[in-house]
UniProtKB/Swiss-Prot annotation:
Catalyzes the terminal and only committed step in triacylglycerol synthesis by using diacylglycerol and fatty acyl CoA as substrates. Required for storage lipid synthesis. This is Probable diacyglycerol O-acyltransferase tgs1. It comes from Mycobacterium tuberculosis (strain CDC 1551 / Oshkosh). It catalyses: an acyl-CoA + a 1,2-diacyl-sn-glycerol = a triacyl-sn-glycerol + CoA. It holds the Pfam family WS_DGAT_cat. It comes from the Bacteria. The gene is tgs1. The keyword Acyltransferase applies. GO terms for cellular component: plasma membrane.
Amino acid sequence: MNHLTTLDAGFLKAEDVDRHVSLAIGALAVIEGPAPDQEAFLSSLAQRLRPCTRFGQRLRLRPFDLGAPKWVDDPDFDLGRHVWRIALPRPGNEDQLFELIADLMARRLDRGRPLWEVWVIEGLADSKWAILTKLHHCMADGIAATHLLAGLSDESMSDSFASNIHTTMQSQSASVRRGGFRVNPSEALTASTAVMAGIVRAAKGASEIAAGVLSPAASSLNGPISDLRRYSAAKVPLADVEQVCRKFDVTINDVALAAITESYRNVFIQRGERPRFDSLRTLVPVSTRSNSALSKTDNRVSLMLPNLPVDQENPLQRLRIVHSRLTRAKAGGQRQFGNTLMAIANRLPFPMTAWAVGLLMRLPQRGVVTVATNVPGPRRPLQIMGRRVLDLYPVSPIAMQLRTSVAMLSYADDLYFGILADYDVVADAGQLARGIEDAVARLVAISKRRKVTRRRGALSLVV
């Protein structure tokens, strides 16, 4: 089946209720020169896209949401309508490139065509060029999109990566079929029992998420969104992050979120706002994608909703608290609640879930301030048409009153942070990016001079 799931379709609803929202996710690859000509690039791209049918499909919507949107082959598909070329004034610098990315990501994709675009950007200094790839979020989550984008590289031509990409939903031979409602009684009973057990396990997580969403955050960084964006990015060596991880027995995600926390803290202070416990309640997507589903084009995520400790002044204490809160959020059932909710929603008639999602999207959300998503990327350097990919920056959208978003992506030997912000609210997205780099450097310096003492059975620096 090629229908969208409830989660996939929710990204369309988020656009429907707010004309200023564009829910495309992106990846910006900066590549060594020279840039290929348009004909050669189109020919190479066509060859690499051929194994993945999704790039040639558009959505067929049902009137009044009477059925789930469905992927269908576009009879008028023209690659030239999806690949655009633009040039910066030579020699284009990083600020000019990021300004262009902000403008391009603010533009909505045309729902009458396959929901993706590729922009070839020329004019960068040192003969470099760039590729911005945009995919609508209803088409793929961050991990699926990263695998799709890696499939466009030269490395994918020598293996079966692209050919393993499947459609959004596999054929369902038993159980429930959307529209037909054919049910096997014994399987339905088993499924119902499993769902109920999941609901019980996720009850605590549900209460935590509900409390987070319904409690207004003490922050000016959530509210209505304009139609203009700012973009900036940070880059830190993975070796530095891993050194902090080893020293303090934390994860890469802990270090990244602690750095983001410090940067937001500085922004609050400069805006004259006192950082409080609930000033940075953050939506942290959690992948539920199994290894066997890495190449499937859909969304498979749950969520956590921790308060990042912007009220804490000490960098090391911030790292400890981030680690502790993420550990508690995972153990407390927040991620399980998201899984259970999606499992239930996908078993209900689509008109019912579409109505409910649309209603929720229209409610003024003031509890969550930002989103921070971390996607593992290629650990080997990539090449495109024989040219090295020097940098790979992620771009995640903003929506639902979240005026900033931070996407993290590991590539080769570095960890990249992409910051997208509402133009009217954040005057300098570069300040957030620089703050992240400074925060990581500070943690690295602390790790080099700090001795970690062990209590019986645990590190003294970890709560």
